Amino acid sequence: MASKEIKFGRTAREKMLRGVDILADAVKVTLGPKGRNVIIDKSFGAPRITKDGVSVAKEIELEDKFENMGAQMVREVASKTNDIAGDGTTTATVLAQAIVREGNKAVAAGMNPMDLKRGIDLAVADVVKDLQAKAKKISTSEEVAQVGTISANGDKQVGLDIAEAMQKVGNEGVITVEEAKTAETELEVVEGMQFDRGYLSPYFVTNPEKMIADLEDVFILLHEKKLSNLQSMLPVLEAVVQTGKPLLIIAEDVEGEALATLVVNKLRGGLKIAAVKAPGFGDRRKAMLEDIAILTGGTVISEDLGIKLESVTLDMLGRAKKVSISKENTTIVDGSGAKSDIEGRVAQIKAQIEETTSDYDREKLQERLAKLAGGVAVIRVGGSTEVEVKEKKDRIDDALNATRAAVQEGIVPGGGIALLRSSTKITVKGANDDQEAGINIVRRALQSLVRQIAENAGDEASIVVGKVLDKNEDNYGYNAQTSEFGDMIAMGIVDPLKVVRTALQNAASVASLLITTEAMIAELPKKESAGGGMPGGMGGMGGMDMM
């Protein structure tokens, strides 16, 4: 086992604080509308330019093991906030640094770290209650656009794109952000349910120019097994032919003789038909087939349920106004499933999302939910260079997450004003002087955001804080973009409550742990072994005459 180095008390906390400061100082320059960029060197390709706090934090690794521990703890604050709220990483980092700094001073002055922690926890709970009381629910598209614009560092177009996407696919819909091949940023909305399986044969195509198969007013047969011959399907095929309507087969696979027979019938014009593979794998495939069945009002043909292909009737088939199939995707628009059944399925998937502990499963369940409840919107990010596209994509991702958070829990005045106002509303009392000191640490830390935003904008922080607090109005604050004072919500400067709340709770949680740390253990660097000397020369070659 390698030797360890141990540091105690004040020495340990000073090292840790230095690490916290290095990381936080690099992250906090990005805060606010006039925050600066950070350039990150990459081992290959062009350097990355970003204003995203968590991207900066993730790149920082310090040489000194003890300093690095402090930095990594604060990095954890940024990552956790990003995971839960999707934004607010810089806010969380600035708050954590402020609480650790103030807490360290109090510990150095001889106060009890555990009582300080209790005081911090009491104050944070009080502030969260105050924030929740003054949060404003958002309902209009304009308010959604405002939140998106703020999170994208004042880019109005991004805010409008996100608002439009949310309007079209609903709050439950999936909105993805991709890199475009052009210089323009555009929004594409896929209505209905889309899954990533295309036609099994190009002969099913009805539009040779676009290479897509469009089927209108279509019957949909859902089968969970492979189809290799059509003998057992003949009764239902004949029934569909009688109606004169097209048929889409969704099965695990359609192969060999079955596929050949379908293609021949399609080419002869006797049968308007297309076949695609079912989406997903294993249990997820079964669940997705069930989703499609509920959306289209059909039944999944499954031997588990005792249904055989021979006994399938027309009323077991799903129906949809339109199905569009490309080489890679199938989109079902306007399925004829009962609204109550779809709502029941949506509620069931929401319950599964609440219960699951796996991020991957949660993501897949959310995709299924979106396909049933709304649709899918894709924001394609354009730009002149790869570096510009990546930077813009980072901002749009942040803005999208912030907007979703705002819809969930509502908004509060932005620019750090909500926390600054809450610092004057903390009414909770500590059980002793040390707990009171913990409460005061939070009071002072809550000013740090407005101070940092003002500093980044080149204004005098103390004057800004003083001016804001002089006026006793909840929404009155400081607009760093224009250096003006006024009603923050009227100016469109808002923050999602979920982001502010999560940032504060995570910052206080990690900062409390750092304050109550008394010892740090790190592995000693391995000593390089001294390099071997030069190999000895050749021994004498006795007995030989030299010519």
UniProtKB/Swiss-Prot annotation:
<dbReference type="GO" id="GO:0051082">
    <property type="term" value="F:unfolded protein binding"/>
</dbReference>
<comment type="function">
    <text>Together with its co-chaperonin GroES, plays an essential role in assisting protein folding. The GroEL-GroES system forms a nano-cage that allows encapsulation of the non-native substrate proteins and provides a physical environment optimized to promote and accelerate protein folding.</text>
</comment>
<dbReference type="InterPro" id="IPR027410">
    <property type="entry name" value="TCP-1-like_intermed_sf"/>
</dbReference>
<dbReference type="InterPro" id="IPR001844">
    <property type="entry name" value="Cpn60/GroEL"/>
</dbReference>
<dbReference type="GO" id="GO:0140662">
    <property type="term" value="F:ATP-dependent protein folding chaperone"/>
</dbReference>
<protein>
    <recommendedName>
        <fullName>Chaperonin GroEL</fullName>
        <ecNumber>5.6.1.7</ecNumber>
    </recommendedName>
</protein>
<comment type="subunit">
    <text>Forms a cylinder of 14 subunits composed of two heptameric rings stacked back-to-back. Interacts with the co-chaperonin GroES.</text>
</comment>
<feature type="binding site">
    <location>
        <begin position="30"/>
        <end position="33"/>
    </location>
    <ligand>
        <name>ATP</name>
    </ligand>
</feature>
<feature type="binding site">
    <location>
        <position position="495"/>
    </location>
    <ligand>
        <name>ATP</name>
    </ligand>
</feature>
<dbReference type="GO" id="GO:0005737">
    <property type="term" value="C:cytoplasm"/>
</dbReference>
<feature type="binding site">
    <location>
        <position position="415"/>
    </location>
    <ligand>
        <name>ATP</name>
    </ligand>
</feature>
<feature type="binding site">
    <location>
        <position position="51"/>
    </location>
    <ligand>
        <name>ATP</name>
    </ligand>
</feature>
<keyword id="KW-0963">Cytoplasm</keyword>
<dbReference type="InterPro" id="IPR027409">
    <property type="entry name" value="GroEL-like_apical_dom_sf"/>
</dbReference>
<keyword id="KW-0067">ATP-binding</keyword>
<comment type="similarity">
    <text>Belongs to the chaperonin (HSP60) family.</text>
</comment>
<dbReference type="Pfam" id="PF00118">
    <property type="entry name" value="Cpn60_TCP1"/>
</dbReference>
<keyword id="KW-0413">Isomerase</keyword>
<dbReference type="GO" id="GO:0005524">
    <property type="term" value="F:ATP binding"/>
</dbReference>
<feature type="binding site">
    <location>
        <begin position="87"/>
        <end position="91"/>
    </location>
    <ligand>
        <name>ATP</name>
    </ligand>
</feature>
<dbReference type="InterPro" id="IPR002423">
    <property type="entry name" value="Cpn60/GroEL/TCP-1"/>
</dbReference>
<keyword id="KW-0143">Chaperone</keyword>
<dbReference type="InterPro" id="IPR027413">
    <property type="entry name" value="GROEL-like_equatorial_sf"/>
</dbReference>
<keyword id="KW-0547">Nucleotide-binding</keyword>
<dbReference type="GO" id="GO:0016853">
    <property type="term" value="F:isomerase activity"/>
</dbReference>
<dbReference type="InterPro" id="IPR018370">
    <property type="entry name" value="Chaperonin_Cpn60_CS"/>
</dbReference>
<dbReference type="GO" id="GO:0042026">
    <property type="term" value="P:protein refolding"/>
</dbReference>
